[in-house]
């Protein structure tokens, strides 16, 4: 591998890390109750989401909504979520055998007592957009070759790690979700399917 290629891959890795840090920055303020502060925080989260989408589009990692216009696309999305459901059920069974009732990640979210609108913005909009850009788009698509098994495994393990697993069952859930999403990205190279 050439020095230029190694440097470029390292810079993509740093970009992925920076984006994750930017995504996490607003979580410092999730306990705010003032309506104006909540509104501002939601706006910041939406801007981070829009920035991630813009960056993904500019880097050629996203094609846009036209990708979702086919029946095949929706079939793949359905199969992806079926895979996530299966992995989650397996992980939940292992958690039950371990005597673990909740993941650390879930406990943090529940104990934060977030405003419901903040919670929805963070967990339904910002986190999925940013995490797909980082773990599938940048790590699998740019740091590694999208077809790389090493990239698939490493991005899956890192995806599991950032969700703070506290048991084998939780590892199965989050790393399994990362592996499912990564497998779909590896096969079709479309973040929109993830």
Regions found by a protein language model. Name each.
Residues 1-18, 58-89, 144, 150:
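Interfacial transmembrane-helix boundary/kink motif in multi-pass membrane proteins
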Residues 5-13, 37-42, 69-77, 115-120, ...:
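Residue-level signature of transmembrane alpha-helical entry/exit and packing/kink sites
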Residues 6-59:
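Alpha-helical transmembrane segments in multi-pass membrane proteins
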Residues 17-26, 81-89, 156-164:
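Aromatic-anchored segments of alpha-helical transmembrane domains
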Residues 31-36, 95-103, 142-149:
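Membrane interface segments of multi-pass transport proteins and intramembrane proteases
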Residues 45-53, 103, 177-186:
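Alpha-helical transmembrane segments and their membrane-interface exit regions
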Residues 61-127:
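Juxtamembrane helix-loop-helix connectors linking adjacent transmembrane helices
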Residues 116-194:
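Transmembrane helix-loop-helix hairpins at the membrane interface
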């Amino acid at each position: 591998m050439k020095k230029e290629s190694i440097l470029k891959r390292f810079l993509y890795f740093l970009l992925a890390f920076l984006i994750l840090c930017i995504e996490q920055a607003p979580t410092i303020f999730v306990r705010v109750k003032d309506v104006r502060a909540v509104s501002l925080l939601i706006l910041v989260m939406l801007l981070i989401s829009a920035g991630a989408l813009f960056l993904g589009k500019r880097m050629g990692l996203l094609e846009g909504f036209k990708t979702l216009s086919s029946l095949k696309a929706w079939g793949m999305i359905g199969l992806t979520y079926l895979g996530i459901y299966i992995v989650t059920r397996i992980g939940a069974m292992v958690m039950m055998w371990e005597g673990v009732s909740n993941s650390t990640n879930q406990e943090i979210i529940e104990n934060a007592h977030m405003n419901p609108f903040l919670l929805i913005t963070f967990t339904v909009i910002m986190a999925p957009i940013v995490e797909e850009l980082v773990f599938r788009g940048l790590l699998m698509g740019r740091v590694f070759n999208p077809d790389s098994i090493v990239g698939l495994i490493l991005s899956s393990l890192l995806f599991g790690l950032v969700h703070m697993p506290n048991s084998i069952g939780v590892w199965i859930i989050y790393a399994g979700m990362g592996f499912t999403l990564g497998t779909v990205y590896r096969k079709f190279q479309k973040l929109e399917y993830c």
